[in-house]
From Swiss-Prot:
Lineage: Eukaryota, Metazoa, Chordata, Craniata, Vertebrata
UniProt source species: Rattus norvegicus
UniProt-recorded name of the protein: Factor VII-activating protease
GO cellular component: extracellular space
PANTHER family found in the cross-reference section: HYALURONAN-BINDING PROTEIN 2, TRYPSIN-RELATED
An annotated GO BP: response to bleomycin
Keyword Protease attributed: yes
One Pfam assignment: EGF
EC number(s) given by UniProt: 3.4.21.-
Family: Belongs to the peptidase S1 family.
Length: 558
């Protein structure tokens, strides 16, 4: 099957009706492509229900399938950054920002170092009063780095190093014991990096040109993309220090250095690659084996507040970090004349090295596939994204299509480690749990995706909505799918508000259901009919639990 024909058949549309979502399979033909299409050429069309009607939630029943409700609140996604409080003001909002942040969304860090209060040191921005501190150059000390300590008293050399004074009172040197180095003998023999150094957490703070690194919260870095106040800084090992790091996936650790009083540049660091014998457990790196990583500490947990998690977004831009297990499958192949290469299917991260998706999304070579984790905006490369190649595709052996309907539509993607690791857990990248028991009909669940359609139209922003599970007996009724739903499938959606709609969601993406604050991937977006009128059809994950676990263990050699 050609790639173009494949894409015609794999992309599932989940209809947003009012603020609800149901599924649609592709027609056997495609509309003439728009040569001027860009990812921004889309719109949301939805009907608003009356406030009185939306204020109540009716009980579910086959006669009254009201499986969806909404809650419009400008603060529901907490648009305020850096811990700001969102305050509703009519139909809009304002942000109450904690110091030292300001701006309409608390996005700006106030520079408390403009008057250069540090005489012999670097002025650093902090989040506690007076919202700055001075990092003094040795042997200077004091709140403004103006006082000089007696050199070598006390001994600044670490790990048994011996301090020697020079003629100039501020000059000294450390004689380091064997295998230790650095200005203060602070760098040990195992301080090295593996791979590209993304996981490096050592203490080297000098560049290959022997320039000292700036602190990541230096006031000089406030306009840089990488600093202590960036999204997910801790995940990248960035904090109140000046140690070398590699947050952007360059080929080795680096840092910023000072050029003059106002200008900075970056340089690679003077840190060594670990010898092969030490590469498995470098002291300065996250210790994760390549072949099989242990799972994250927990699954199915977001770092959103409970209040925010339970709100409905229904077709609006999803909050970053609300679906941290959402995966974007992307290809280097052109999909259609109107759909450029890039995102074409969704998936769910169920283990640091494993992605769960639909089998019909995997009819191409691994060399043309990549997996992007933590993605929110398809047109931007965001700092918290993690990208991996696919090492292996494993489809369920009994996957097949009959009358253009996929059966047993499930596959696993084994990720190829980068720098000795697969996915690293962060606010934006987490695993979702596998369910152990079925969820009852009427359970409210979540769908998410970028809404890619067969003509290439879709949202650049991740969208989400809530739907409710529908009993297979009802979904198999003559008015719906007329006995085409088998026990490996589950339906979810809304039949209450047919009409003007925009479709969202991606084949292979997750249908997640929550229990006791934990999210489980209960379904995989598979197929559907009549966008906006019939429920979406999902692969029921509980039917394949044994295959999923057995496959992962077999590939790990367990």
């Amino acid at each position: 099957m050609s790639v173009v024909m494949l894409v015609f058949r794999v992309l599932l549309l989940i209809a947003l009706v009012g603020n609800s979502a149901i599924g649609l399979s592709l027609m056997p033909f495609i509309a003439p492509p728009d040569p001027d299409w860009t990812p921004d050429d889309y719109y949301y069309s939805y009907e608003q229900s009356s406030p009185d009607k939306d204020a109540s939630v009716t009980q579910t029943s086959p006669e009254n399938p009201d499986w969806y409700y909404e809650d419009d609140d400008p603060c529901q996604s907490n648009p305020c950054e850096h811990g700001g409080d969102c305050i509703i003001r009519g139909n809009t909002f304002s942000c109450s920002c904690p110091a030292p942040f300001s701006g309409s969304r608390c996005q700006t860090v106030q520079n408390k170092c403009k008057d250069n209060p540090c005489v012999q040191g670097d002025c650093l921005i902090t989040q506690t009063p007076p919202y700055y501190r001075c990092a003094c150059k040795y042997p200077y000390t004091g709140p403004d780095c103006s006082k000089v300590l007696p050199v070598c008293r006390p001994n600044p050399c670490q790990n048994g190093g011996v301090c020697s004074r020079h003629r100039r009172r501020s000059r000294f040197s450390c004689a380091c014991p064997d295998q230790y180095k650095g200005r203060f003998c602070e760098i040990g023999p195992d301080d090295c990096y593996v791979g590209d150094g993304y996981s490096y957490r050592g203490k080297v703070s000098r560049t290959v040109n022997q320039n000292p690194c700036l602190y990541w919260n230096s006031h000089l870095l406030l306009q840089e993309n990488y600093n202590m106040f960036m999204e997910d800084a801790e995940t990248h090992g960035i904090a109140d220090h000046n140690f070398c790091r590699n947050p952007d996936g360059d080929h080795k650790p680096w840092c910023f250095v000072k050029v003059n009083s106002e200008k900075v540049k970056w340089e690679y660091c003077n840190v060594e690659v670990c010898p092969e014998s030490d590469a498995a457990n470098p002291v300065g790196s996250l210790q994760e084996p390549v072949m099989e990583l242990p799972g994250f500490d927990s699954c199915g947990k977001t770092e959103m507040t409970e209040h925010a998690v339970k709100r409905i977004y229904g077709g609006f831009k999803s909050t970053a970090g609300k679906h941290p297990w959402q995966v974007s499958l992307q290809t280097s192949l052109p999909l259609t004349t109107s759909m450029p290469q890039g995102h074409f299917c969704g998936g769910s991260l169920i283990h640091p090295c494993w992605v769960l998706t639909a089998a019909h999304c995997t009819d191409m070579s691994t060399k043309h596939l990549k997996v992007v984790l933590g993605d929110q905006d398809l047109k931007k490369t965001e700092s918290h994204e993690q990208t991996f190649r696919v090492e292996k595709i494993l489809k369920y052996s009994q996957y097949n299509e009959r009358d253009e309907i996929p059966h047993n539509d499930i596959a696993l993607l084994k990720l190829k480690p980068v720098g000795g690791h697969c996915a690293l857990e962060s606010k934006y990248v987490k695993t979702v749990c596998l369910p152990s028991d079925p969820f009852p009909s009427g359970t409210e669940c979540h769908i998410s995706g970028w809404g890619v359609t067969e003509t290439g139209e879709g949202s650049r922003q991740l969208l989400d909505a809530k739907v409710k599970l529908i009993a297979n007996a009802l979904c198999n009724s003559r008015q719906l799918y007329d006995h085409t739903i088998d026990d490996s499938m589950i339906c979810a959606g809304n039949l209450q508000k047919p009409g003007s709609d925009t479709c969202q969601g991606d084949s292979g993406g997750p249908l997640t259901c929550e229990k006791d604050g934990t999210y489980y991937v209960y379904g995989i977006v598979s197929w559907g009919q009549e966008c906006g009128k019939k429920p979406g059809v999902y692969t029921q994950v509980t039917k394949f639990l044994n295959w999923i676990k057995t496959t992962m263990h077999k590939e790990a050699g367990l």
